[in-house]
From Swiss-Prot:
UniProt feature, compositional bias: Low complexity: 77-88
Gene designation per UniProt: slx4
Family: Belongs to the SLX4 family.
GO biological process: DNA recombination; DNA repair; DNA replication
Composition skew (Basic and acidic residues), residue ranges: 158-173, 258-275, 601-613, 621-635
Protein's recorded name: Structure-specific endonuclease subunit slx4
Subcellular location: Nucleus
Record text on subunit structure and interactions: Forms a heterodimer with slx1.
GO MF annotation: an example: 5'-flap endonuclease activity
Location of the region described as Disordered in the Swiss-Prot/TrEMBL record: 59-173, 254-287, 484-523, 593-697
Superkingdom assignment: Eukaryota
Gene Ontology cellular-component terms listed: Slx1-Slx4 complex
Taxonomic source organism: Talaromyces marneffei (strain ATCC 18224 / CBS 334.59 / QM 7333) (Penicillium marneffei)
Secretion signal span: none
Keywords: DNA damage, DNA recombination, DNA repair, Nucleus, Phosphoprotein
Length: 792
């Protein structure tokens, strides 16, 4: 007995329950249900009681302890499994232990053969229910034990089967199958396609019925598999990819379907070729000149119908869109709205076209082209008349007793400054004569009627010039680029009244006395160009200064010193030229009785003798200026004008002036340039803005000739300066620039340093003994266009 229990494994009852690992052998239908190989005919279903008869008998014979785990076969197959309470040793295990290891080897070989058989079978999953009770687990465990013990039982155990089956049937009928309640079945499943009609035979003695009675539960599962009838070929829609995918199972491809697919593909390719030809879109004809020329060299597009085949296959035969009904082409073709001409025809029509230039509002009008042509002809005709009759560019109105000469003048502006050529001369615009137009005649007639009604205003008579008055020449009248022009008169009593939109006239009352002496009229130097002003200054024997304003002032003084004083007057101010020179001025409320009509003399070059005499007279007037200014202060204090003047006479000095004068100052200076009596007169009426007093410096003590000589000495001294040598630095520092080099480099000149250098070193180079101040140096720099500044 000792040898009997040497290899026995004892498991005490108090030990915890152990979960033994299950076998990993494949669970095939033949192993679970004892199925035979599949038969072609479907078996009939069996009753559940017959299926579980064998299981019940095995459970009744074994009856394992509820606490014992599943039996596990150790490496030694002869070891039986027992518990401490009830040791159960089967006869089969005892016989195998006595016989030796030969029987165990056969058992191992049987297991390996079974696993090899299951390798070629389809694996089926086993569904475990989550709500299984412990009681169901015990039943499944007993089933497995019964299955293993069935394979190991001998012929002696087979004799006891009828008795065991009967006992098991009684237990099942009393206790039930211990199965879990089945889940509720869904009613909305899609039923499988009835490929083969089910044949139901009512004959109980048929061989199929007998065969179905003998079939097991495994054969009934074959009816739930989907089986396709190969005879019925389905309409297969071609895929867009054209090739099988990677996951397609090639085992399912059948030969019959492949044979039917080939003619279908051939048919579809033929249809696609037809649609390729029919649906090829016609090329759009070029509609531009560039497209017409480049269409000849463009490559032919061969990829137009490549994607038609895929689109047709994707749509399929059953999903073709209905073709749109084609519109019937009318027999009469419509003419195109815009006919595209060839390049030659377009160029020809372009040459025949008359281009009309004008503003947008003019071009948008519906006027005929002849209107524009007539307008252009009228403009050309007026230009030709202006060139032929330059004397018509002035308007002369002659009252009964006196005559008034009116001429065009204009104010300076940015446009007039910009209208210059490369040589600095003012660009001469074309002069359009508007004096003979009927609009001005009507305006003058209306104005004369108004003047007759007014008692204090003079009347205008016919616009015919008298023989005694010479019209202004074309050279003396230089209009600026501004569209409007001022008409100024050199009368004894001017008043500004607008005659037309572009003409301002000056009227005067008829005088009671006839003029005894006719003095020449001082020309308007504001209308001269820079070149003409320089020539005029040189004709007086003086050197021209760079600034235009100073040239005009110098010419005014020279002309007054040569021709004497011109009698001019302001509104409500009675002055006399002799009283102004002597330093006395009186103001009266009476009107000026004697008027003088000035006559313009033709401009001509003067001889050297006349120019020297004019220069001496100019020097004399300039020297007398400081003495006259002292007497002016007393005259200004005594003056009490009744009405404020529309302009003021401003004396132009050589002293320091504003860099950017105000607009009022510019307007006053322009108006006073033609109305100055003497350089000594300076009327400052009430209500006008006071002028900033100019500071006196060294420059005011020099006369014009001295100033010109000093300025020429400054220019010569700058050019004679040599660059100083840097002996101590040995060339490490950059060389010091001369004043001339600084000027060329546009470097700002410090006026104090420059004046100091001139007084110490510069004038010594040109043998000049006099000295200059900062104001004179600044005047010279500004006249030459040199950038200068004071020391900060």
């Amino acid at each position: 007995m000792a040898s009997k229990f040497d290899n026995t494994i004892v498991i005490p009852a108090s030990s915890p329950e152990q979960n033994w690992a299950r076998s990993v052998s494949p669970c095939t239908p033949s192993r679970l249900f004892g199925l035979s190989p599949l038969s072609p005919s479907p078996p009939s279903l069996l009753s559940p009681s017959k299926l579980f008869d064998e299981v019940r008998l095995k459970m009744q014979n074994d009856q394992p302890s509820p606490k014992s785990p599943l039996g596990k076969v150790s490496k030694k197959a002869t070891a039986p499994i027992t518990t401490a309470g009830t040791p159960i040793v089967s006869e089969h295990f005892t016989q195998t232990a006595r016989s030796g290891s030969s029987k165990a080897k056969t058992i191992r070989n049987r297991k390996s053969s079974k696993s090899q058989e299951g390798q070629n079978k389809i694996l089926t999953g086993r569904v475990a229910k989550a709500t299984a009770t412990s009681k169901a687990k015990d039943t499944t465990g007993s089933k497995l034990n019964a299955g293993t013990k069935k394979t190991k039982t001998t012929s002696n155990s087979q004799d006891d089967k009828p008795t065991k089956e009967a006992e098991t049937k009684k237990v099942v009928d009393s206790e039930g199958l211990n199965l879990e309640e089945a889940l509720k079945r869904r009613s909305d499943w899609t039923p499988p396609k009835a490929s083969v009609p089910a044949i139901i035979s009512l004959d109980e003695d048929s061989p199929s019925g007998n065969c179905g009675a003998k079939t097991s539960f495994g054969y009934s599962l074959r009816d739930y598999h989907y089986s396709r009838d190969n005879s019925v070929s389905e309409a297969i829609l071609p895929r867009k990819e054209g090739n099988p995918t990677k996951r397609r199972r090639l085992e399912l491809v059948e030969s019959e379907i492949l044979q039917e697919r080939k003619p279908l593909q051939q048919r579809q390719t033929k249809d696609a070729e037809k649609t390729r030809k029919t649906k090829a879109k016609p090329k759009k004809h070029p509609k531009t000149i560039t497209a017409r020329m480049t269409a000849l060299y463009e490559p032919i597009d061969e990829t137009e119908g490549l994607f038609v085949f895929d689109e047709e296959l994707e749509a399929g035969e059953d999903f073709k869109k209905p073709a749109k009904p084609k519109k019937k082409t009318s027999t009469k073709q419509k003419e195109p709205d815009c006919v595209i001409l060839s390049p030659a025809a377009a160029t020809k029509s372009l040459n025949d076209q008359n281009f009309l230039f004008g503003t947008c509002s003019q071009l948008e009008r519906d006027d005929s082209p002849t209107f524009f042509e007539e307008t252009q002809k009228a403009i050309r005709l007026s230009e030709n008349l202006t060139l032929e009759n330059p004397a018509l560019s002035t308007i002369s109105t002659v009252p009964s007793t006196t005559s008034i000469v009116i001429k065009y003048t204009s104010k300076k502006s940015h446009w007039s400054e910009a209208a210059r050529d490369f040589h600095g001369a003012v660009v001469q615009p074309e002069i359009i004569d508007m004096t003979d137009s009927p609009t001005i005649d009507t305006a003058l007639s209306q104005l004369s009627e108004m003047n007759r009604e007014a008692p204090k205003m003079a009347s205008l008579v016919s616009a015919k010039p008298t023989s005694g008055i010479k019209p202004l020449t074309e050279k003396e009248i230089i209009p600026s680029c501004r569209p409007t022009a001022d008409i100024q008169s050199t009368s004894s009593k001017p008043k500004s009244n607008k005659i037309g939109p572009d003409i301002v006239g000056k009227k005067a009352e008829p005088s009671t006395k006839k003029p005894t002496n006719q003095l020449p009229e001082m020309p308007n130097f504001n209308g001269y160009t820079d070149v003409e002003l320089r020539k005029k200054v040189k004709s007086y024997g003086l050197k021209a200064i760079g600034r235009r304003k100073r040239l005009i002032a110098l010419l005014d003084k020279c002309w007054q010193s040569k021709h004497g004083n011109v009698a001019t007057s302001a509104d409500d101010v009675e002055t006399s030229s002799l009283a102004a020179i002597n330093g006395t001025a009186s103001v009266s409320t009476a009107r000026i009785s004697d008027t003088q009509v000035s006559e313009e003399l033709p401009v001509r070059k003067k001889s050297d003798g006349e120019s020297k005499a004019a220069s001496r007279a100019g020097k004399r007037k300039v020297v007398e200026k400081p003495a006259a200014r002292k007497d002016e202060t007393a005259a200004k204090k005594a003056a009490s004008p009744i009405r404020t003047s529309s302009y003021m006479v401003d004396e132009i000095e050589d002293s320091e002036e504003e860099i950017i004068p105000s607009p009022t100052r510019i307007r006053v200076q322009r108006q006073s340039s033609t109305r100055q009596t003497t350089p000594a007169i300076g009327c400052l009426p009430l209500g006008s803005k006071s002028k900033r007093p100019s500071t006196k410096n060294k420059a005011s003590t020099f006369d014009e000739c001295t100033l010109i000589e000093l300025q020429s000495s400054i220019a010569r001294a700058i050019r004679l300066q040599t660059r100083p040598k840097n002996l101590l630095t040995n060339g490490s520092c950059p060389p010091q620039l001369t004043w001339h080099e600084k000027i060329l480099l546009y470097e700002p000149i410090i006026l104090e340093d420059f004046a100091t250098w001139l007084n110490t070193e510069g004038f010594a180079l040109v043998s000049e003994d006099r000295e200059v101040g900062v104001a004179l140096v600044r005047t010279w720099c500004e006249s030459q266009g040199i950038c200068c500044t004071f020391r900060a």
